[in-house]
Amino acid sequence: GLGDVYKRQDVDCHHTIEDIGIALGTAIKEALGDKAGLVRYGSCMLPMDETLALCAVDLGGRPYFVYDASFAGQSCGGMDTQMAREFFYAVSYSAMMNLHLKVLYGENDHHKLEAMFKAFAKALDAATRRDARIDGVLSTKGTL
């Protein structure tokens, strides 16, 4: 009703980031609905200064995750760099998407992380576009 709810939860970084990935993936899956008219596939090669990252997405309903990125440091901006993999894995499986992420090259860990997140956003945006030429879902089986 009229009250405010506030809950402070002290949870480790790993579980917090993983839970955020699960929540985002679930929200993406629910927002896509039956996927009628969706382009389904999207990719982005994104430069961030000296870094180049690649992301490819298939919203076909079969979760799979490929990740190829390494970092010089254990943390970046207060986040454990290993948690990027955990986040994207959780998004991929919760959204039921095939997700490939690769940092082709780069030196600065911040640029690598930022390029991966932005490439993912751009690839997802491309895959979720609707095309009037697509009748139903883009699948030879007729279902995703």
Language-model features: where?
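Solvent-exposed, glycine/polar-rich loop segments of beta-barrel outer-membrane systems
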Residues: 68-75, 133-144
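Ordered, amphipathic secondary-structure segments that act as subunit-interaction surfaces
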Residues: 18-39
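Glycine/charge-rich, flexible interdomain linkers and switch-proximal surface loops
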Residues: 36-52, 136-144
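N-terminal auxiliary interaction/assembly segments of multi-subunit proteins
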Residues: 7-15
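Short beta-strand elements
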Residues: 53-65
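Short, small-residue-biased leader/transition segments that mark boundaries at the very start
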Residues: 1-6
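A generic local secondary-structure boundary/capping motif
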Residues: 42-45, 54-56, 88-91
